[in-house]
């Protein structure tokens, strides 16, 4: 039985809170709260305004922020504040991405982070992905293979096991591989 290492240290030797602090995660089913936008980004009542704005800008939400009369103090939803704003699923996903960036952990895990975005917003995230994650180690989880093309390494899972690993072009050359099979199954809907 193997073990997972971080900086050559078995992860079971880490303090749990310390270990969890090195990860920022954007799940496809996340929760925003009926508090201010800045508090949602920071996941805390106290937050750094400049950092929250910077993270919202990187996540593609800055234009909407500028249209909000109360800025970062604008309540998300109207549950606790009649002047709160309703946001779309895509906008909520951008706020969730900003939250992960705000945490500024060395590892960022993105589980279908563009699922609720329209195609243009999704393209913006892909085209700026390296700028968004910067020097962090990013794990990008997606069933949509076209969204994995920009990844440095792609791991293909089948039955809970890694069955292929490599870059898009190389994986596509293996006409008997699972990646090729999945890619062509999805591509048939685009032609």
List PLM regions with ranges:
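ABC ATPase NBD Q-loop/coupling interface
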Residues: 1-18, 123, 127
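Conserved "ABC signature" C-loop
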Residues: 30-82, 178
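ABC-fold ATPase nucleotide-binding domain signature/coupling loops
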Residues: 62-95, 104-106, 189-191
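C-terminal portion of ABC ATPase nucleotide-binding domains
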Residues: 71, 127, 144, 149-191
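Catalytic Walker B motif of ABC-type/P-loop ATPase nucleotide-binding domains
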Residues: 108-112
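Helix N-cap at the start of a conserved alpha-helix in ABC-type nucleotide-binding domains
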Residues: 119-121
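Conserved catalytic loops of ABC-family nucleotide-binding domains
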Residues: 131-140, 148
């Amino acid at each position: 039985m193997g073990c997972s290492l971080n900086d050559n240290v078995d992860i079971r030797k880490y303090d749990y809170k310390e270990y969890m602090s090195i990860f920022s995660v954007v799940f496809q089913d996340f929760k925003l709260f009926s508090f201010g936008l800045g508090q949602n980004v920071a996941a805390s009542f106290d937050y750094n305004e400049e950092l929250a704005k910077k993270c919202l800008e990187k996540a593609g939400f800055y234009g909407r922020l500028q249209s909000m009369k109360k800025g970062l103090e604008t309540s998300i939803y109207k549950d606790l504040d009649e002047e709160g704003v309703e946001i779309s699923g895509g906008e909520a996903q951008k706020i969730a991405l900003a939250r992960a960036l705000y945490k500024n952990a060395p590892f960022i895990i993105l589980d279908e982070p563009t699922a609720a975005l329209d195609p243009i917003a999704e393209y913006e995230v892909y085209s700026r992905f390296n700028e968004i994650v910067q020097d962090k180690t990013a794990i990008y989880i997606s069933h949509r293979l076209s969204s994995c093309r920009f990844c440095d390494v792609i791991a293909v899972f089948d039955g809970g096991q890694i069955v292929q690993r490599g870059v898009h072009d190389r994986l596509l050359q293996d006409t008997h591989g699972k990646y090729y099979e999945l890619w062509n199954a999805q591509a048939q809907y685009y032609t």
